[in-house]
Amino acid sequence: FGENEYVQTIFMKKNDSLATAFDVPQGITAMVGGGGKTTLMLRLAQELVQRGARVIVTTTTHIFPPEGIPTGNPTNAEEVAHALLIEPLLCLGKPLKDGKLGAPDLTMTALSCLADYVLVEADGAKHLPLKAPYEYEPVIPEETQLVIAVAGLDGAGQPIQDVAFRSGLYAALCGKKETELVTASDIALVLAHEAGQRKDVPQGARFAVLLNKADDTARKTTAQEVAAELNNDSVERVVIASLGGKS
């Protein structure tokens, strides 16, 4: 690939498959960033189960237990294997005091030996569309095959301090003040930056981007501007979608 080759960009229509758009591999896929990680994870899980796969959704940080999915924290592999024979989609995590789930007791490696796909929310963003990682973030399993960085297009044109989790870090990466407005260039910069969304991506893992909340013409234009500033030496593909749901 040439240094300035454009990244592959995929516009999602309503009934298109996200799993196909991202070419989700068997094994571990991790979601980082802001603006729709949980929604993405659950949509991918449902699509993969419909294909006949066994899927585990989990976290290395914390998530709320998703509705309608059997949830638990088994301490032995046999328990998980048995549960997957009954229910092809499980959510695994350790119950926390605030009602959320933390990382499960079983390792991600163990889980990936039991299910066809393990989908991991590996970052938190307090429901904000954009995110810059702190020094201990994200928590991406080293065996991860695909990392998907999520950015919410509703952050564009807004003050950094209002739409970015860890806004001071986000502003610093962009060379701006927190009171300045987010541009398409800023979103692209943080997505591709090794201190931004590409932080701690395991060697050999694929790296893709979801530009979420492309709900209207203006946001779709912003998405195209972001994609045009990304090149394929850092990002494999960009998927532009409007997933709805909570971030």
Predicted regions and their residues:
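General beta-strand structural signal in soluble alpha/beta enzymes
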Residues: 31, 56-59, 91-94, 118-122, ...
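Walker A (P-loop) phosphate-binding motif
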Residues: 14-49
